[in-house]
Amino acid sequence: MSESVRTNTSIWSKGMLSVIVAQFLSAFGDNALLFATLALLKAQFYPDWSQPVLQMVFVGAYILFAPFVGQMADSFAKGRVMMVANGLKLAGAAGICLGVNPFVGYTLVGIGAAAYSPAKYGILGELTTGDKLVKANGLMEASTIAAILLGSVAGGVLADWHVIAALVACALAYAGAVAANLFIPKLVAARPGQSWRLSAMTRSFFSACVVLWRNGETRFSLVGTGLFWGAGVTLRFLLVLWVPVALGITDNATPTYLNAMVAVGIVVGAGAAAKLVTLETVSRCMPAGILIGVVVAIFSLQHALLPAYALLLLIGMLGGFFVVPLNALLQERGKKSVGAGNAIAVQNLGENSAMLLMLGLYSLAVLVGVPAVAIGIGFGVLFALAIAALWIWQRRQASY
């Protein structure tokens, strides 16, 4: 990386474009690798309950390193942190290609992802400012959604052709992300010289957790976003199990196409939320959250591809409308209390803890032999009830 300071704050500067390209390739690799590795587990005759466990080891890395990755991003040049993180992802993907246990390789990818997250968001504010920062965040989210769509589909389609070829493609995507990171200017570390004592770092992180949890609005946001992303990742794995049972389709590509419909819907729903919901009217998003659970239950009863696509598109639209206002609320209130970086780190911990819990319950249901359709119906009903309870709780808190 070349030594430089921020002189060009345009969202089309070389540094900003390098960040966006690196983010696209890294997110593409993440999504393609998930479905390629799931195909590998199927090819090697791992039991069905092992599929969500794969994601659990990834999420576990996020939780384990949550107190430390924020400080790491602030203590070094963020472009360099991103490069090292993508290097860890590359090592994990390459290891799986070379026969390393897929759970071990995927854990390494999870460690890289945990380190990558705060750096990729934090660097935007160092490369641009003001209104351009909003546009830069928009570019980041657009590249991420595009990577989710293309990566998920590519992982499934390539795995149907050749599993190892799919895994190699993932490793190449991570290598491209590392190369893109080389073109990010080396910026001054935001907060160098901080204490690296584990006790001090952990204490600082959990004090931020306490501050956010004691505030009614941020607590409401943390619970809502945690439930949403926990449900979202569980739905991903439910689709892999549900498609052969409900639709009679046994390829690796169809679940990725269905997942892509959810991502498209999220984009539409997020756009609607931006126009219809403000920080003062966040509660408008709650009916959409309840409807997510209702539609998931209806979806689980389908036996044809076309209505399945339509219902997943609707689930994504409801999800985007639900989660975007909650994210904005946490970022705004968190910035004023513990700082934006700490707020994101705490949110990551909450979301990944919810993912771990929901994936654990899903794995248990599969292990004891609950049918995929029954899991989907129960999952949808429980999610709708959980969001309804959260809404009632929030209204009572607001009335005090």
UniProtKB/Swiss-Prot annotation:
It is found in: Cell inner membrane. The chain crosses the membrane at residues 19-39, 53-73, 91-111, 139-159, 164-184, 195-213, 227-247, 257-277, 281-301, 304-324, 352-372, 373-393. Signal peptide: none annotated. The keyword Transmembrane applies. One of its GO terms (molecular function) is lysophospholipid:sodium symporter activity. It holds the Pfam family MFS_1. Keywords: Cell inner membrane, Cell membrane, Lipid transport, Membrane, Transmembrane, Transmembrane helix, Transport. It is a multi-pass membrane protein. One of its GO terms (cellular component) is plasma membrane. InterPro entries: LysoPLipid__transptr_LplT, MFS, MFS_trans_sf. Belongs to the major facilitator superfamily. LplT (TC 2.A.1.42) family. Catalyzes the facilitated diffusion of 2-acyl-glycero-3-phosphoethanolamine (2-acyl-GPE) into the cell. HAMAP family: MFS_LplT. This is Lysophospholipid transporter LplT.
